[in-house]
Amino acid sequence: MISLLDIRARIADGTLPAADAIRGARERIAAQDPAIGAILRLAPETAVVPEGGPLAGIAVGVKDIIATADMATEYGSDIYAGWRPRADAAIVSRLRALGAVPLAKTATTAFAGLDPAATVNPRDPGHTPGGSSSGSAAAVAAGMLPLALGTQTGGSVIRPAAFCGVAAIKPSFRLLPTVGVKTFSWALDTVGLFGASVADIAHALALIAERPAIEAPAPERPRLALCLQDFAGSADADALAALERAARAAERGGAVVHDLVLPEPFARAWAVHPTVQDFEARQALAWEYAEHRDALPPVLRGQLDRAQDLTAADYDAARREAHRARRQLKELFADVDAILTVSSVGRAPRGLGSTGDARFNRLWTLMGVPCVNVPVPGDGLPLGVQVIARFGDDGRALAVARGIEGALARE
């Protein structure tokens, strides 16, 4: 993989011009992407490459539900074939202001739903890269790009990061702007980042969010709660072994680890995530459903069909459950610095018929808290664990994740 921090260091010391860094990304995409299908289209060759700015020389992949004025934005659907926004999304404008080059639109499932894209997992093309941010995770994993944007409504950043073996963060809700991002669920949709290491995504997030404290170090002896989320079902043996390995690595790095069983309000909140999501999706995609229902892919079409039966009372009750769980989570974090749990049920499923299961992600998306995927090194397809911190404490989540990543690397 290509490190954002390494590129920036080489640009800073004068050994790598920013234009050469962007040219190198174009060359890697041309060489590697035909076998992976992560990239949908590239910015024009004539695009300006800034020589200055804290992210100068950084080529960024932009999930194709995020508007770009210089490239078509099709939302993964033929309904929007060739559609060209008049303006960049706010997050894209921010990247340009920092000197980065939004170089490529990355593959997404249609409207960031569950119907798979054509992208394959660069670790093994016989397996899914996950979704819905399929292309962003795959492009970083394949070493084509040092940074990519994704979005998460259920598990669409953390799960593909785990399947592809890259670092990623789903930040606190609304830390990054969603203006210009196609809405699926306005109470859940969150822009996230993929990178080669936790340090890379921490640096990028600190700059994009204008919060330097995000790169602050972790407490000397962070308190970690090891959580299995039993109400979500069982992870497989490999995922549980990776979680145990990460916990022991954290202890060697100085963390204090104890087990945590989440109380009943969290099980109820987990259960109502689909109600919040689908009630809002029914409205967010109302035009597409009314005018182009038959052009919608089958899983999304069925999801929206079922969502027509949801009532405002169902939605309001679900939101109340979520609010109760958020209050209790705030109290829980008085005694712990971070929660450690699995990122996915297991390794990436075989074939491209499914993007995997978000069961271990969706509670934390509903809670709006920061989640970081930490790859766990090993043989075979990648596995990951997620580090979760209190709302607004993205820096702590990243610092703890960085400590675990380092401890695993020293094994």
Residue ranges and their predicted role:
Residues G14, G57, K63, A97, ...:
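Glycine-rich, small-residue loops and helix-cap segments
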Residues A18-I22, D238-V261, A286-E291, Y315, ...:
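Acyltransferase
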Residues A69-A72, L207-V272:
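Gly/Ser-rich, acidic/histidine-flanked active-site/gating loops
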Residues A87-L205, P370-P377, P382-G384:
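Short glycine/serine-rich loop segments
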